[in-house]
């Protein structure tokens, strides 16, 4: 059955189709005969209890520089849609959170993927702390003294914003580095929220693995190797993707978290693993499926739509 699918995303014109997961999901939906509509979070509204968006009919093509066509914008009641993909990139701020409040008014009559209530209640750097034995030692605080004590205990640490994304604002403080006090002052000025200190994992030099799960089951992975001059492995900041298989430890991690993902209705999830430790559970806008398909041919977008269609 053909579905009406609205994609809530950053504007399609800004997408780098080579590595964009939202674009891959849209291509697969179109291939299956589903009708695509596009809108950005700024076009989402609620009036007298009716949730609507100014949507444009969308066609996509896997052609760099000519990857989309949009129709005329029309305001539509979103309950007329069968599926909405919640796919704008973080930051996970009040603007993002407000969209989840609006979309939960129409879910599950209109299936919103991922479930907006659980997206709001599962920030990736906090959700992961439900599995402390799978993580490196981690501190969430805004108390500078707590961070300094943590640093004395572990030496090498990572300091990063609680709601950042794409590697922005992530710092590696090696044992003996004298910049901690200045960084804490800067974080206190830039962020109202607490931030994260985490024991530095030397295994990151061999890569930070992104594992994709569909309905709580692992379906593919890629390794992201940091450059020689950077502590971060995110592809947004120059991390090099390479083909990877799951290790027994990574399968153990997936088996542990899978039931919680299913319970919360998370269809598409990306987790980050360094060595033997999970560092994040990404439920907002996980990426990596285009790279995985290029490496080993796994069409994760098809597995995603199989799971979505089974719910309609």
From Swiss-Prot:
It holds the Pfam family GSH-S_N. Binds 1 Mg(2+) or Mn(2+) ion per subunit. Keywords: ATP-binding, Glutathione biosynthesis, Ligase, Magnesium, Manganese, Metal-binding, Nucleotide-binding. Residues 125-309 form the ATP-grasp domain. Pathway: Sulfur metabolism; glutathione biosynthesis; glutathione from L-cysteine and L-glutamate: step 2/2. Its EC number is 6.3.2.3. SUPFAM superfamilies: Glutathione synthetase ATP-binding domain-like (SSF56059), PreATP-grasp domain (SSF52440). It is an enzyme of class 6 (ligase). GO terms for cellular component: cytoplasm. This is Glutathione synthetase. It comes from Brucella melitensis biotype 1 (strain ATCC 23456 / CCUG 17765 / NCTC 10094 / 16M). The lineage of its organism: Bacteria, Pseudomonadati, Pseudomonadota, Alphaproteobacteria, Hyphomicrobiales. The gene is gshB.
